[in-house]
Amino acid sequence: MWFGKFGGQYVPETLMEPLRELEKAYKRLKNDEEFNRQLDYYLRTWAGRPTPLYYAERLTKKVGGAKIYLKREDLLHGGAHKTNNAIGQALLAKFMGKTRLIAETGAGQHGVATAMAGALLGMKVDIYMGAEDVERQKMNVFRMKLLGANVIPVHTGSKTLKDAINEALRDWVATFEYSHYLIGSVVGPHPYPIIVRDFQSVIGREAREQILEAEGDLPDVIVACVGGGSNAMGIFYPFVKDKSVRLIGVEAGGKGIESGKHSASLNAGEIGVFHGMLSYFLQDEEGQIRTTHSIAPGLDYPGVGPEHAYLKESGRAEYVTVTDEEALRAFHELSRTEGIIPALESAHAVAYAIKLAREMSRDDVIIVNLSGRGDKDLDIVLKVSGNV
């Protein structure tokens, strides 16, 4: 329930019953043979696991220094790591006897992943989305509807993600007998950060086996981008006990920390309570959640998962920032040297890995979690970069 002093269940009494029910069911099902057999089946045959660990030889040569490997979550069905958690939680809900999934989404990626999992398992899906985001993300809204989901625009407050979260929670309190609230990252009240981490840690388990096979040794460094933090937690967790492996999370530096236009909760935030958990958040003097900025829609979250807060405080992981500009450069670099167009989120991790590789020796090994593909970001890049 707690990661050091972080985490917890900072929720109204009305949410305690559904959370207790979820915790009990997860404890029962996580080692259940039939549940795991079905999860493994869908991950393999529907989602396309295991994803490859790819040695980026041309990028490595160009950069000079450490070998750079990419864990190819961009090749997962749906185009990003989000699918691991969506199918895991949807199956969990089905085993609990639920018939409906509720989720909130900002950029739309988590909504799409939830809609995919709901369609696969024959469940009703309702997605809450800030009215402003509905306007900005027309293609993802269409995708969700195509997959059979009902998209509910939220017109309250700032009409963005945090308002969508409030509406989704309100719905869950009223309907939890037959609904499951599917959180998309390692955030929220206990047991969500643990559940999401466990479903995502398939990334790290595979990467560990794959790097031992390729190099005969563990990597020196693992680099992953951090918004809420689920792709990073997924690749970090199976390596946490290996003290020789440096774990580096890359936050969105936006237009630079000094500018105030960023999403770097661990580097520039303060400890507070939001979304049912104690963690680091970007807050103003009054403790109100600040508006965030990142060129990568998926890093635009004003907080971070409690386990990351704990890994930072305990010194087990390091957290750095990469600006919009640096991420864009890495986006183009990887596209041109390896023929892989990364998501802008993942490009933050690539950018830091390039910087780091230059300072390391040729015998050293870096694994980058390439958490998603960049098709969804082409409009953004076109606007910012103009003709490539």
UniProtKB/Swiss-Prot annotation:
Lyase found in the keyword field: yes
GO MF annotations, alphabetized: tryptophan synthase activity
Keywords assigned by UniProt, alphabetized: Amino-acid biosynthesis, Aromatic amino acid biosynthesis, Lyase, Pyridoxal phosphate, Tryptophan biosynthesis
CDD domains, per database record: Trp-synth_B
Pathway: Amino-acid biosynthesis; L-tryptophan biosynthesis; L-tryptophan from chorismate: step 5/5
Highest taxon of source: Archaea
GO cellular component: cytoplasm
Catalytic activity: (1S,2R)-1-C-(indol-3-yl)glycerol 3-phosphate + L-serine = D-glyceraldehyde 3-phosphate + L-tryptophan + H2O
UniProt xrefs under Gene3D superfamilies: 3.40.50.1100
Cofactor(s) required for function per UniProt: pyridoxal 5'-phosphate
EC number: 4.2.1.20
Subunit annotation: Tetramer of two alpha and two beta chains.
Record's function text: The beta subunit is responsible for the synthesis of L-tryptophan from indole and L-serine.
Protein name (database record): Tryptophan synthase beta chain 1
